[in-house]
């Protein structure tokens, strides 16, 4: 049976794991690392890079390098968070045809789901090269506080990447699964998950294989990226103070500053001070300018203090919704790379009144939990029951624009709730229902998931028709709606037409694009391999020709030289088939050279053998003297 992989699709880094026997195993990528940067780059030559190779060239290609795209997934272009991000990233964020936030590189638009799919493809390839078989099914994690549009967009990304997404699972829940799989005694735990782009906190009761989420809360626009941005802003301000030059509009300098900020942030988790050195950051008429700033841990903590404190409110809300006090939490599990920051650990300890648990790898535990959930769905992992919750209330807009809740937040999923609606006017034949998700009292302040029309209602006085609408949230946290006219018994399955999101046709087109790209990538790889082989043959043939050219006829020598010239010309192009054909032609004509080399070697060996014979015949003239050893004792007797 083919394996189901678990993928932690992160804002900054992604990770893939698979069940290996009874344990989840994190798979190393082609570069030998256990996590892969969630970065996609398009070079000037239209080559697509993913992961570490994309990150390495970011400084020289800021506009073509896409990072932290997860922050845009499922968001509208006019979302205030998108507007904020637009000014901070070097690449272009544009309005998609559906009104969502998309990105643009080299004049081509991509949806965040497409870019995420490219990262998922990289993770899929990583798993396939380890398992030695094709992977088609996956469990993908999302922040617990993701809304329906963001979950749907993540599922779409999986589909574009050629994966059947068996389950979308919340990151803190996945982490709890990996943490508590081998623990039999009952515990109440809090998972504090501060990653690259999002923050979640979940309260769970675990024991005897049952993982029940009691509540969840969070902030989908708070993470390590914000800490980096805060540090970049500080460095820009300090440099301006010192040199009078504003680096804000220099995309190349900003990319270098971002890399340096991330590095400094990581270093300050283990040391009290670091130095940021960026030579030749810019130049003016007086010459090149260098940036050199010493940064202490205390200074960094003061710069990001409000960001750290922003994690406290969701913790309070999660405890309140679970009906618990901080002292009733048995263990606090830290997840996400940002939880390595000492200040974060201090705040967690102060809030929960206990030392946080550090026995899990914060970068890998989510992917491991996803792999375990994959094992559960496949039947390989027995006696595990996962009860998750919906993070946000679901409801509709009623008279006066009020938000009427149908399913409250922190309701265990899957769940179903029905409500009967009627008409507002006589002989009304259609009703428009607008579905929202959120916690505000007015519908307009919440996230519009979409709207649908119930049509074909038989003519009747207002208030008479009885239309039962059922809202159903599946185990992925994705909303489905069905409606039934009680009078006629007619039932409609209604798909919410999201206000944005990708249509089936969009997804189909993107799947085809991804397949075409995979084919193009394969061709490009074949071309590179063919070039490497050809260059190696040219080099070795030229070397042999210089050494043994006098051993072949003038015609053969010319044929070899012509074949080398033809192959060199072919190497200037990208036609892999032509390169292969010319390589084969050179290999064939250079066989004469190989023969000459072989004959020369044999002749040298023959000469060596003759010399050896002469030496042995002269040896025959030497007579070995016989001698007898006499014992000293015998001598004296």
UniProtKB/Swiss-Prot annotation:
GO terms for molecular function: ATP binding; ATP-dependent protein folding chaperone; unfolded protein binding. Residues 516-529 have a biased composition (Basic and acidic residues). Keywords: ATP-binding, Chaperone, Nucleotide-binding, Phosphoprotein, Stress response. Pfam families: HSP70. Residues 601-617 have a biased composition (Low complexity). InterPro entries: ATPase_NBD, Chaperone_DnaK, Heat_shock_70_CS, HSP70_C_sf, HSP70_peptide-bd_sf, Hsp_70_fam. The keyword ATP-binding applies. Induction: By heat shock. PROSITE patterns: HSP70_1 (PS00297), HSP70_2 (PS00329), HSP70_3 (PS01036). Residues 516-542, 601-637 are annotated as: Disordered. Gene3D superfamilies: 1.20.1270.10, 3.30.420.40, Actin, Chain A, domain 4 (3.90.640.10), Substrate Binding Domain Of DNAk, Chain A, domain 1 (2.60.34.10). The keyword Chaperone applies. The modification Phosphothreonine is found at residue 198. Acts as a chaperone. Belongs to the heat shock protein 70 family. This is Chaperone protein DnaK. It comes from Brucella ovis (strain ATCC 25840 / 63/290 / NCTC 10512). The lineage of its organism: Bacteria, Pseudomonadati, Pseudomonadota, Alphaproteobacteria, Hyphomicrobiales.
């Amino acid at each position: 049976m083919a394996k189901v992989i678990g993928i932690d699709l992160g804002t900054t880094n992604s990770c893939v794991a698979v069940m290996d026997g009874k344990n989840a195993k994190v798979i190393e990528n082609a570069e030998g690392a256990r996590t892969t940067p969630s970065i996609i780059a398009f070079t000037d030559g239209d080559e697509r890079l993913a992961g570490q190779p994309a990150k390495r060239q970011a400084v020289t290609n800021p506009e073509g390098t896409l990072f932290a795209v997860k922050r845009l997934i499922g968001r509208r272009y006019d979302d205030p968070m998108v507007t904020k991000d637009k000014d901070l990233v070097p690449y272009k964020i544009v309005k998609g045809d559906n009104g969502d936030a998309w990105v643009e590189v080299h004049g081509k638009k991509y949806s965040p789901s497409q870019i995420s799919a490219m990262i998922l493809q990289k993770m899929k390839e990583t798993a396939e090269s380890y398992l030695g078989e094709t992977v088609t099914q996956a469990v993908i994690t999302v922040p617990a506080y993701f809304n329906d549009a963001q979950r749907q967009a993540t599922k779409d990304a999986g589909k574009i990447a050629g994966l059947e997404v068996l389950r979308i699972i919340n990151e803190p829940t996945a982490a709890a699964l990996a943490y508590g799989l081998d623990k039999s005694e009952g515990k109440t735990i809090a998972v504090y998950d501060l990653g690259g782009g999002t923050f979640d906190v979940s309260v769970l009761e675990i024991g005897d294989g049952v993982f029940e989420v009691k509540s969840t809360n969070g902030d989908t626009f708070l993470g390590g990226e914000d800490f980096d941005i805060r540090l970049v802003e500080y460095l820009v301000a300090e440099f301006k103070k010192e040199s009078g030059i504003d680096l804000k509009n220099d995309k190349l300098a900003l990319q270098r500053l971002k890399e340096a900020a991330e590095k400094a942030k990581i270093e300050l988790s283990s040391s009290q001070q670091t130095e940021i050195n960026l030579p030749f950051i810019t130049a003016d008429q007086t010459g090149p300018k260098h940036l050199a700033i010493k940064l202490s841990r205390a200074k960094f903590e003061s710069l990001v203090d409000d960001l750290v404190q922003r994690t406290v409110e969701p913790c309070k809300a999660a405890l309140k919704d679970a009906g618990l006090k901080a002292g009733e939490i048995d263990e606090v599990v830290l997840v996400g790379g940002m939880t390595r920051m000492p200040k974060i650990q201090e705040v967690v300890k102060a809030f929960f009144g206990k030392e946080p648990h550090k026995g899990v790898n914060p970068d890998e535990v989510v992917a491991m939990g996803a792999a375990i959930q994959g094992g559960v769905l496949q039947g390989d992992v027995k006696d595990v029951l996962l009860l998750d919750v919906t993070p946000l209330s679901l409801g509709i807009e009623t008279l006066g624009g009020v938000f009427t809740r149908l399913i409250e937040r922190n309701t265990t999923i899957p769940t179903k709730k029905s409500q009967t609606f009627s008409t507002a006017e006589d002989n009304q034949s259609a009703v428009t229902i607008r579905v929202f998700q959120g916690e505000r009292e007015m519908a307009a302040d919440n996230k519009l998931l979409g709207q649908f029309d119930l049509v074909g209602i038989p003519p009747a006085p207002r208030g008479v028709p009885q239309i039962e609408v059922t809202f159903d949230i599946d185990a992925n946290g994705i909303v489905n709606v069905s409606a039934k006219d009680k009078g006629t018994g007619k039932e409609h399955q209604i798909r919410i037409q999201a206000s944005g999101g990708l249509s089936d046709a969009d997804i189909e087109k993107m799947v085809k694009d991804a397949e075409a790209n995979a084919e193009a990538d394969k061709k490009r790889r074949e071309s590179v391999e063919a070039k490497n082989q050809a260059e190696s043959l040219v080099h070795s043939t030229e070397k042999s020709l210089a050494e043994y050219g006098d051993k072949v006829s003038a015609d053969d020598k010319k044929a070899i030289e012509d074949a080398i010239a033809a192959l060199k010309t072919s190497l200037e192009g990208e036609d892999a088939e032509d390169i292969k054909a010319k390589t084969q032609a050179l290999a064939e004509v250079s066989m004469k050279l190989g023969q000459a080399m072989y004959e020369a070697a044999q002749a040298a060996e023959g000469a060596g053998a003759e010399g050896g014979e002469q030496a042995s015949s002269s040896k025959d003239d030497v007579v070995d003297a016989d001698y007898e050893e006499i014992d000293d004792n015998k001598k004296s007797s």
